[in-house]
A protein has these predicted regions:
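Arginine residue identity/basic-tract feature
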Residues: 11, 20, 27-28, 44, ...
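Acidic/His-rich structured neighborhood in mature extracellular/periplasmic domains
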Residues: 1-43
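Short, conserved helix/loop micro-motifs enriched in His/Cys and acidic residues
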Residues: 1-5, 45-54, 89-93
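Soluble non-cytosolic domains of exported or imported proteins
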Residues: 9-17, 59-63, 100-107
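Pan-zinc metallopeptidase signature
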Residues: 72-126
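Post-HExxH zinc-binding segment in Zn-dependent metallohydrolases
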Residues: 29-81
Length: 126
């Protein structure tokens, strides 16, 4: 609630939990039901990314849903950034928190997000 209302007491400051949750909702209730090919592409991209050592010690490493949610947050410039110097061994995030950084770091995930959401200029307000 604090995150959605842009409260100063938001424990998720720097990221948008609505975008994150919406990403999972789209996957489970739209892509899985109507566009299984895209959902399968997420699974393949996740497996390749993890095999390549991407997303180490982040939420995106946990499973393909977390991977998708973290990617969508970054696609909408709505993810928290933890630089390598700031990150602990089990950090939730890394330095990827914008659309451009996602395109460079994980082009496969960026391409899937772009195919689902298009090149929209929309970004969350807080």
């Amino acid at each position: 609630e604090e995150n959605l209302l842009c409260s100063t007491e938001d424990r998720y400051e720097g990221e948008d939990i609505f975008v994150r949750t919406f990403a999972l909702t789209i996957r489970r209730f739209a892509l899985d039901a109507v566009d299984e090919g895209t959902s399968a592409a997420i699974n393949r991209a996740y497996a390749r990314a993890i095999a390549a050592g991407l997303w180490e010690n982040t939420l995106a490493e946990i499973n393909d849903d977390e991977y998708w949610m973290e990617g969508v947050q970054s696609y909408f410039d709505a993810n928290r950034e933890d630089t390598d110097e700031d990150r602990g061994p089990n950090s939730s995030h890394n330095a990827v928190n914008t659309r451009d950084e996602l395109a460079e770091y994980d082009p496969a995930l960026w391409a899937i997000a772009e195919s689902v959401f298009g090149d929209t200029p929309w970004r969350p307000e807080c």
